[in-house]
Curated annotation (Swiss-Prot):
There is a cross-link at K115, K171, K283, K649, K886, K898, K925, K983, K1349, K1350 (Glycyl lysine isopeptide (Lys-Gly) (interchain with G-Cter in SUMO2)). InterPro entries: BTB/POZ_dom, Rad18_UBZ4, SKP1/BTB/POZ_sf, Structure-sp_endonuc_su_Slx4. This is Structure-specific endonuclease subunit SLX4. It comes from the Eukaryota. The gene is Slx4. SUPFAM superfamilies: POZ domain (SSF54695). Keywords: DNA damage, DNA recombination, DNA repair, Isopeptide bond, Metal-binding, Nucleus, Phosphoprotein, Repeat, Ubl conjugation, Zinc, Zinc-finger. It comes from Mus musculus. Residues 7-24, 296-305, 798-808, 877-894, 1401-1412 have a biased composition (Polar residues).
Length: 1565
């Protein structure tokens, strides 16, 4: 029992057993209990038992509690245990066993390993069956595998083998490899090797590297964090890891595959694409690609070489196409040229140099071979055959007519030879017949030669074009052509002809302007016309028709027939072209570089010319229709076709065309008709008188017609003399002074003419005769050559002037012949006339000075001005027949001058003087004189010598209406009578400058010899309708015109400054009121003075001021008293002219024979040399324009005194509100002080300035004279419209039949200066070329509303309705884009600004007025003389700017405003609308000046920062400028000045808050 129990004695009951056995219990229940306990323990699991064992005591306690046991039993059990544990070995062993079991149970419960279960952490495999070593090995393997699986995650995509850049995707790696290879210049082969090595290394070294790497990674990943990340990477990378090598291989294979196909096509294109891409990526890459082509694109040297060869070939081919003679083809040459061509072709084949030599035309080879080579590329083999044939035909054509018929016969064979290539025999025959038909239709086949020629020409045009190059192919060449070759060529041509305009397989369409569509084929265009195919490729667009997309190009400006013919030539070298299509074909050929066709087209006209030689000659004689029209007009004027033939000279015709436009020609035609009637009437009135002068005039003027006209004019002159004896007396006084001394001595005929002119001066009183006489004057300018022809100077006698005027009239009729003679005379200026002029000027006789004045305006600075003013004045009349409409272009219209140089040469001669007077009609040749440039020798003999002074000034003749001319003639005669007018030429160089600027055309000078001019100017302001009388009446307008012309110097005399339409005779007095006021020479009879309107008064003032200025500039050579007739004359003359003369006269002769003039001189004061200048103005002939013309002239030009002193006169003249000529700043600058005021107003201004200025005031600053001029300008602007002007003149006439006293005139001028003459500025602006390029105005009207809002926002303007925004933007643009200089800064283009300018001018005028007011005080020089010439020019420019403003608003309105301002100061008149406008302008100007005077405020305005309106108003009030809030806002708006009323609104709101209830308001009240 014991041994058994021992092994099984793991249970506690064993001790009991042992105890039992050892100490048997006496009772049975006790044994049974033990057995049961064992059984229970055996049945229970160890853990339970263990737990129970631990709980044994409690259980036992519980059992003991539950099952009451006997105390003896319990005690026995306890004792047994105690005995076993302590005393017995068995108990000890049991305790140990129990303890061990407890530990085992606890360990087994803690970990699986202790329980004998082992699992792999990596793969979860059960390792319980393995020992510790094997388990470790297994775990290591799993770790390695895990590392291997995770390792590809880091190097998933290989780095770049070149730069080592890592990649996230294979695509990025592939693209980078190519780009990097290009950048690093790694060849494709080397790149492939690097990639392969990169992929091979992991394969070869994968085992060693991977383990090591894996070990590292494993070691890292054994950490908790790494192990967690690894599985994630494995999941992502597992699929990619196995394909890594595959991906690399694919990348490499792709690059290789791309290179192969890409290299050939991409070589040209991909290179650019790569470059572009590289450039887009990095800027540095842009530089390298051009140096080295992309490496990956270029595969090998062979491919690269081929590509280079292709490029070079392409370039060479392009050059060949562009070259006029394509490279010769050796094989073709040999074929075409049998023997000679063969060896010649061989040479080119062997050496390229031979071909070049052939192309160089060295002459080593026959022309035929050269043609063959050159024509083949464009024309293929056909060309050579055609060329030989053409040469054959050409010789035939060149042969005489008898041979030509054979040529026609041979032309068929010849045509066959060329057509051998192009057409079949039947086709050739048809073409030949067609050519004959065309020629017959054209009337070319009338003669056998043309007919014969026509056939070959049509057939051989193409070949003939080749000979045109200078090579004539031998006939043998055509003979060489075989019939078979010709047949094949004909078939080829036929086949190609079938393709012309054939939609079948057409890949190009040409759409014409008519909408017709022509079909063509690119390959034909490519082969025949590279430029056309290029045009198609660049300019074509896709059009879809019937579902097919085709290229379509637009052929504009081409007729359908011409386009068809062009395609026929391209397709089959068809040379049959109707002559009517030749121009269009030639234009197409030139457009698309078909040189052969161009040559053919040139040949066709040649044939036509041969057939019709007469028409060609006729066209040569008359180059243009305009010429023919001019000839017809001349024939009408001359009344004889023979004279027309003389006028048909090409030189004259060319000049005429240059100077005369169609509108002007029409006006001239009308004027000619009127003048004829007047001339006829004059002849009937006084045939005897006219006959005598005619003889003289005929002697003077070469053409007989001129003589006849001069006779007629003499008759008219006599009639005028009878009507104006007073004027004649004045002329006589001039003669006494020495007018005719040199002139008469040198030209007795002219002296006689001068007498005739005197008679004319008398007759000038008769308005009708005056008009005729004016016309005569106008005609005179037409005959400067004739005048020159008579080398004798013009007599100083008024008769001579009248004769000259009559001659001028005759010349008008004989304008053609006269022009021819004039050109001749201009070429050879008469020394006698020149000497005469100089002598007269030296002598200082009135007549001489007159003559000098004419010449002086062109020759000497001062004298030239006065003369030029006179001449220009006179020339305007002369021009009137030719250019009544556009006096500005009067010189151009009457462009009879031959050569400007010749004119200049004549300027030194008396003829030049006459031209300066403006008697000569043709100003075209004379160079325009720069008004600003004044010869500084006022008293020098040359300056005195009108010829010298003239300096080739273009003579402009103003065309006047019959009434105006008559009036002007009277005035001219009066002015001629006064010696003062004559003295005018001696005036300061300035006046000469002004007039020189006004350059009257040399032809005028030529037409009227200096004597004639002087006589006409001196005596013939009456007699000078043709001469100075007409000029006197029109002088101011003419001067204005001439000044403008001078402004337009470069363009020759300008007739744009024509005076507004001449009023009726009643209005104009003896002379035009303007002329009377302006021209001092012209007597200012009481009637004339009365007739003179306020504008003439202004003109006189202007002339006086100008004269004073001139006197300052030029010491008065001769004191001249202003005669009444002289003053009248000045009135008639443009202010510029009258100024110089009147000024000189006044300075030289304080007293003038004429009572009116004396009064004038007294008022103007002796120092006023301007009065003498005024006589100079008399010389100017005014041309009556239509109302429109008058209006334009009034706005544009003011009377400019050609002889006036440059500065002051310029002021007055250029302040020409009345003068029609627009004055530009440039013109003003050239003119210097010249002003373009209306003739009458300028005269008045000159007179006033003279009154204000002492005789020494000739140089008085323009400021003083400026004011006067501005006054006159104001009047002129008031009379901006012809009606206003004439009304003004009529008012003047009504005011004083006699010339108003100088004091009155000065006062008037002074008033007028008070108001700046904005219209004058406006006029100037019209013709003013912008100093800075004019920025084109954006098209605001088509802009979207958001864009408009943005534009307005730029200028700080709030959004407005679209229409208002457009208007506002346009206004802003006008203000911000000025074309004038700083002087015109204030002159914003808006009409309001012009009003402001008048204010500024008014201030300037005011400064001048004080000096003017003391008419007789020489202290005036302090006012006007204080300003230097530069200041005068500045003042002139200011006036011009003011005039420019007048253009913005009606010149009449501004003129009225100016008059009102003047009257407001000098005469109190009820406030009128014009006065209100002037006041508004003054206010606006004051506001502008105030803003400019405040730098901070000005800066704020310039920055478009809003100005507080209320504050500005308050400041203005404080400074004495009260302005209503509404008016101020309008002014600021007009100036584009942003302002705000926020402060005022806030104040109002505050005020309202303070007074919330109506009761409070009432209480306060």
């Amino acid at each position: 029992m014991v041994p058994e129990s021992a092994p099984n004695g793991n249970s506690q009951p064993l001790p009991s057993c042992f105890t039992t056995t050892g100490v048997p219990s006496p009772s049975k229940p006790r044994v049974s209990e033990l057995v049961l306990q064992r059984m229970k323990q055996f049945k229970r699991a160890d853990p339970e038992r263990l737990r129970h064992a631990s709980e044994e005591s409690p259980q036992k306690t519980a059992l003991g509690d539950d099952v009451p046991r006997s105390p003896p039993e319990e005690t026995v059990g306890e004792n047994e245990y105690k005995l076993d544990a302590t005393d017995s070995d068995a108990a000890m062993a049991l305790a140990l066993q129990q303890e061990f079991r407890r530990e085992e149970a606890s360990s087994h419960h803690d970990s699986l390993e202790e329980k004998g279960l082992f699992f792999c952490q990596m793969c979860q495999k059960n390792l319980s069956a393995m020992n510790v070593t094997r388990r470790e090995q297994h775990v290591n393997r799993c770790l390695d595998e895990a590392e291997k699986a995770q390792r590809p995650a880091s190097p998933r995509i290989p780095d770049c083998p070149i730069c080592g850049k890592p990649f996230l995707t294979t695509k990025s790696r592939i693209s980078h490899l190519k780009q990097c290879a290009v950048r690093m210049e790694v060849g494709p082969q080397l790149l492939l090797q690097a990639v392969r090595l990169q992929t091979a290394q992991p394969e070869v070294d994968g085992s060693p590297q991977v383990p090591s790497f894996s070990n590292n990674v494993g070691g890292l990943k054994r950490k908790g964090v790494t192990t967690k990340r690894e599985p994630r990477r494995r999941k992502v990378n597992k699929p990619e890891a196995p394909s890594e090598d595959l991906l690399v291989a694919m990348a490499l294979s792709r690059s290789e595959v791309e290179h192969c196909p890409v290299v050939p096509p991409l070589r040209l294109e991909n290179a650019f694409s790569e470059k572009i891409r590289l450039g887009a990526e990095k800027k540095s890459r842009k530089k390298r690609p051009p140096v080295c082509p992309p490496q990956l694109v270029t595969q090998d040297s062979e491919t690269t070489g081929r590509q280079i060869e292709d490029r070079v070939a392409q370039l060479l081919s392009e050059e060949a196409e562009l070259s006029c003679t394509p490279p010769l083809l050796a094989s073709k040459i040999s074929k075409e040229e049998l023997e000679p061509a063969g060896w010649r072709a061989r040479l080119p084949e062997g050496k390229r140099n031979f071909l070049w030599e052939l192309s160089a035309l060295t002459g080593a080879w026959a022309e035929e071979s050269f043609y063959t080579v050159g024509l083949f590329p464009p024309i293929v083999s056909q060309c050579p055959s055609k060329e030989p044939q053409l040469p054959l035909e050409l010789p035939k054509q060149g042969e005489p007519s008898p041979r030509r018929p054979p040529a026609s016969q041979s032309s068929l064979p010849v045509s066959h030879s060329p057509k051998i290539r192009l057409l079949s025999s039947s086709q050739r025959e048809r073409q030949a017949l067609q050519d004959l038909v065309d020629l017959a239709v054209e009337g070319l086949s009338s003669s056998p030669q043309p007919g014969s020629r026509g056939v070959p020409t049509g057939l051989d045009l193409v070949p003939s074009s080749l000979p045109l190059t200078g090579f004539v192919l031998p006939c043998k060449k055509t003979l060489k052509k075989d019939d078979s070759a010709s047949l094949s060529l004909g078939l080829l041509v036929t086949d190609f002809g079938a393709m012309v305009n054939n939609p079948h397989l057409s890949d190009v369409q040409f759409q014409l302007d008519s909408g017709e569509v022509l079909y063509a084929h690119k390959f034909v265009l490519y082969a025949r016309c590279p430029l056309l195919i290029q045009y198609v490729s660049t300019e074509s667009f896709s059009s879809e028709e019937d579902g097919d997309l085709t290229q379509r190009a637009l052929l504009s400006d081409v007729s359908s027939e011409a386009a068809h013919a062009f395609l026929n030539y391209l397709y089959m070298a068809d040379t049959d072209m109707p002559p009517s299509l030749v121009p269009d074909l030639r234009s197409l050929a030139l457009r698309f570089g078909v040189s052969d066709l161009v040559q053919l087209c040139e040949q066709v006209p040649a044939v036509v010319d041969l057939e019709g030689e007469q028409p060609e000659e006729t066209s040569e004689d008359c180059e243009s229709r305009a010429e023919t029209f001019l000839e017809l007009l001349r024939s009408v004027w001359v009344d004889n076709e023979e004279e027309v033939e003389t006028l048909l000279k090409p030189e004259l015709c060319e000049e005429e065309r240059e100077r005369v436009n169609e509108a002007e020609m029409e006006e001239i035609y009308e004027f000619a008709a009127t003048q004829r009637k007047l001339l006829q009437w004059g002849r009937a009135a006084d045939p005897d008188g006219s006959t005598n002068p005619h003889g003289e005039d005929g002697a003077v003027s070469e053409p007989s017609l001129a003589g006849v006209q001069s006779n007629r004019q003499l008759e008219n002159t006599e009639h005028m003399e009878s009507s104006g004896l007073e004027k004649e007396e004045a002329l006589a006084s001039w003669e006494q002074e020495g007018h005719s001394t040199p002139l008469q001595d040198q030209c007795p005929d002219w002296a006689g003419k001068a007498e005739a002119q005197d008679a004319l001066g008398e007759a000038t009183d008769d308005p009708s005769f005056c008009s005729r006489h004016r016309r005569g004057k106008e005609c005179l300018p037409l005959h400067p050559n004739k005048a020159h022809g008579c080398k004798q100077p013009l007599p100083s006698n008024p008769r001579v002037s009248s004769e000259l005027s009559q001659i001028t009239v005759d010349h008008e009729e004989q304008s053609d012949h006269v022009r021819e003679t004039q050109a001749d005379m201009a070429q050879a200026p008469t020394p006698h006339s020149c000497s005469l002029v100089s002598q007269s000027s030296v002598d200082g006789s009135p007549s001489q000075s007159w003559l000098h004045l004419y010449h002086t305006s062109h020759l000497s600075p001062s004298v030239s001005q006065s003369h030029s003013s006179i001449s220009r004045v006179a020339s305007p009349r002369s021009l009137s027949p030719t250019t009544p409409t556009k006096q500005r272009r009067g010189s151009n219209i009457v462009t009879l001058r031959k050569d400007a140089g010749h004119h200049r040469g004549q300027q030194s001669s008396p003829i030049a003087g006459h031209r300066n007077r403006g008697i000569l009609i043709s100003p075209a040749k004379s160079p325009p004189i720069d008004l600003t440039q004044s010869v500084p020798e006022p008293l020098s003999p040359r300056a005195q010598d009108p010829l010298h002074f003239v300096k080739k000034e273009d003579e402009v003749i103003l065309l006047l209406d019959s009434d105006e001319e008559l009036e002007h003639t009277k005035t001219e005669s009066v002015s001629k009578d006064s010696p003062e007018g004559r003295k005018v030429p001696e005036f300061s160089p300035r006046s000469s400058e002004l007039f020189s600027v006004i350059d009257v055309e040399e032809d005028h000078e030529h037409f009227q010899s200096p004597l004639k001019r002087e006589a006409g100017l001196q005596h013939g302001e009456e007699g000078q309708l043709g001469n100075q009388s007409a000029l006197g009446c029109r002088d101011i307008p003419w001067l204005l015109c001439s000044q403008k012309t001078s402004l337009d110097e470069d363009s020759a005399t300008d007739t744009s400054w024509l005076v507004p339409a001449t009023p009726g005779v009643s209005r104009s007095r003896d002379c035009s009121s303007q002329t009377q006021i302006k021209s001092l020479k012209t007597r200012i009879p009481s009637d004339e003075t009365a007739q003179q309107t306020p504008r003439p008064n202004l003109e006189r003032r202007t002339m006086l001021e100008t004269a004073q200025q001139f006197s300052v500039i030029m010491p008065h050579t001769q004191p001249i008293t202003l005669g009444a007739f002289d003053s009248g004359r000045q009135a008639y003359r443009s202010p510029s002219h009258p100024y110089p003369r009147h000024h000189r006269l006044s300075s030289s002769q304080p007293s003038c024979p004429g009572p009116d003039f004396t009064r004038w001189s007294q008022k103007s004061s002796a120092p006023r040399p301007c009065l003498p200048n005024l006589p100079a103005a008399d010389d100017v002939v005014e041309v009556g324009d239509s109302d429109d013309e008058v209006a334009s002239h009034q706005g544009n030009s003011s009377p400019v005194l050609d002889g006036d002193p440059p500065g002051p006169m310029g002021d007055y003249c250029w302040n020409e509100p009345l003068s029609p000529i627009p004055i530009d700043h440039l013109n003003l600058e050239r003119t210097g002080p010249l002003t373009t005021s209306s003739p009458s107003s300028q005269v008045l201004e000159a007179l006033h300035s003279d009154d204000c200025h002492s005789p020494g005031l000739g140089t008085t600053p323009i400021r003083g004279s400026c004011g006067t001029l501005r006054e006159s300008q104001e009047r002129s602007s008031l009379a901006g419209s012809p009606e206003a002007l004439w009304d003004d003149w009529n008012e003047e006439e009504g005011q004083s039949p006699e010339a108003p006293p100088v004091a009155q005139m000065l006062s008037t001028r002074t008033r007028k200066p008070d108001r700046p003459e904005t219209p004058k500025g406006a006029n100037q602006k019209k013709n003013l070329p912008p100093k800075v390029p004019i920025t084109p105005m954006p098209r605001y009207s088509i802009m979207e509303t958001p864009v408009l809002k943005k534009e307005l926002d730029r200028f700080g303007v709030r959004a407005l309705p679209k229409r208002q925004m457009v208007l506002k933007l346009k206004e802003i643009f006008q203000y911000t884009h000025q074309t004038l200089e700083s002087d015109s800064e204030d002159e914003v283009q808006s009409p309001q600004i012009p009003a402001e300018l008048p204010c500024r001018q008014a201030s300037t005028t005011e400064t001048c007025n004080p000096s003017r007011l003391p008419t007789g005080e020489p202290s005036h020089p302090d006012g006007d003389a204080q300003l230097p010439a530069s200041q005068e020019s500045m003042a002139t420019s200011v006036d011009g700017s003011d005039n420019s403003f007048s253009s913005k608003s009606s010149s009449a309105e501004f003129g009225a405003a100016f008059e009102y301002s003047d009257e407001d100061k000098d005469e109190e008149v009820g406030v009128t609308a014009s006065q209100a406008a002037i006041q508004a302008a003054d206010t606006e100007e004051a506001v502008r000046r105030y803003i400019r005077s405040k730098p901070a405020l000005h800066r704020q305005v310039l920055r478009y920062q809003p100005v507080e309106l209320a504050e500005l108003q308050a400041e203005l009030k404080q400074n004495g400028i009260p302005v209503a809030m509404g008016k101020l806002s309008d002014i600021l708006d007009a100036q584009c000045i942003t302002f705000t009323t926020a402060a005022a609104r806030k104040e109002k709101l505050k005020h309202k808050r303070r007074q919330p209830s109506g009761r409070k308001k009432k209480d306060q009240k």
